[in-house]
Amino acid sequence: MVQMQTYLTVADNTGGKIAQCIKVLGGSKRRYAKVGDIIVIAVKQAIPNSPVKKGDVHKAVIIRTSKEIRRKNGTYVRFDDNACVILDANLNPRGKRVFGPVARELRDANFMKVVSLASEVI
């Protein structure tokens, strides 16, 4: 689960390295976000000469969380880190590559482009 002030790893090749959640979208009182939810992030660390700069504000989708995800068949899946992929205005991924595994729940959240860019879907 991700809430405001949570630091996340940026898992794409846009140039951002570390981002901070500044808003969870989907209701005025919404506190937590899970895999497949859209959040607003501020880039805290970035690679020099990249399209994404430190201090930029973007929308992002969460692709991994440290908090376990319960599936319908009773299994649980959890990852080592909290990670996101930066999105453009049309909610398409801004980068051309996604690093690391992504959760299968992104397929249910209609982020097929992110799923197809990922090397591994768990």
UniProtKB/Swiss-Prot annotation:
InterPro entries attached to this UniProt entry: Ribosomal_uL14, Ribosomal_uL14_bac-type, Ribosomal_uL14_CS, Ribosomal_uL14_sf
This protein's record includes keyword Ribosomal protein: yes
Keywords, comma-separated and alphabetical: Ribonucleoprotein, Ribosomal protein, RNA-binding, rRNA-binding
One CC-aspect GO term: cytosolic large ribosomal subunit
Any single biological process term in GO: translation
Gene Ontology MF annotations: large ribosomal subunit rRNA binding; structural constituent of ribosome
Gene3D superfamilies membership: Ribosomal protein L14
Keyword Methyltransferase in record: no
Record's subunit section: Part of the 50S ribosomal subunit. Forms a cluster with proteins L3 and L19. In the 70S ribosome, L14 and L19 interact and together make contacts with the 16S rRNA in bridges B5 and B8.
NCBIfam families, per database record: rplN_bact
Function: Binds to 23S rRNA. Forms part of two intersubunit bridges in the 70S ribosome.
PANTHER family: 50S/60S RIBOSOMAL PROTEIN L14/L23 (PTHR11761), LARGE RIBOSOMAL SUBUNIT PROTEIN UL14M (PTHR11761:SF3)
Family: Belongs to the universal ribosomal protein uL14 family.
Protein name in UniProt: Large ribosomal subunit protein uL14
Organism annotation: Borrelia duttonii (strain Ly)
Protein encoded by which gene: rplN
